[in-house]
Amino acid sequence: MIIYRDCISQDEMFSDIYKITEVANGLCLEVEGKMVSRKEGEIDDALIGGNASAEGPEGDGTEATVITGVDIVMNHHLQETSFTKESYKKYIKDYMKSIKARLEETKPERVKPFMTGAAEQVKHILGNFKNYQFFVGENMNPDGMVGLLDFREDGVTPYMIFFKDGLEMEKC
């Protein structure tokens, strides 16, 4: 499995269990999720590869709290945050500077394509600003990456957008 981490906060943003597509000429990764419902405190056996206990039926007849949300957000403990258009412009300007500095050190050949593509992508984001929900990593680092959540035209299928150059891949 590959875990994609925010290169600034080191927070886990998503993994390769989802359908991942490069968009915006390879500048961003679009990660498709789905809406799920879970009992609070319950861990999906599919995520850990485990089996239900053979010791007998679970539960003691109490009602469980059911939480419904996007699997990417729930599985990776992403935290919702909010922005006005102006506050997002300020955030994204500072974030782009951080990524540019990182690229200058690690991948200088990516600086120009990143800066050109990022300007276009930010225009697109601002043009569709009202459609997005914003999520940061578990540690809620204000300098870290903000993932954008939107829904496909069907209104049911959620997807998130992340800047590819702001991510590190870690094999587990």
Curated annotation (Swiss-Prot):
Localisation per UniProt entry: Secreted
Chief location category: secreted
A single Gene Ontology CC term: extracellular region
Tissue: Expressed by the venom gland.
GO molecular function: calcium ion binding
PROSITE patterns hit by this protein: TCTP_1, TCTP_2, TCTP_3
Pfam families associated with the record: TCTP
Domain spans labelled TCTP: 1-172
InterPro entries reported for this sequence: Mss4-like_sf, Mss4/transl-control_tumour, TCTP, Translation_control_tumour_CS, Translational_control_tumour_p
Keywords: Secreted
Signal peptide limits: none
Similarity remark: Belongs to the TCTP family.
PANTHER family: TRANSLATIONALLY CONTROLLED TUMOR PROTEIN-RELATED, TRANSLATIONALLY-CONTROLLED TUMOR PROTEIN
Additional facts recorded: Secretion of this protein from cells may proceed via an ER/Golgi-independent pathway, probably mediated by secreted vesicles called exosomes.
Function, as annotated: Venom protein that causes edema, enhances vascular permeability and is likely related to the inflammatory activity of the venom.
UniProt name for this protein: Translationally-controlled tumor protein homolog
Organism: Crotalus adamanteus
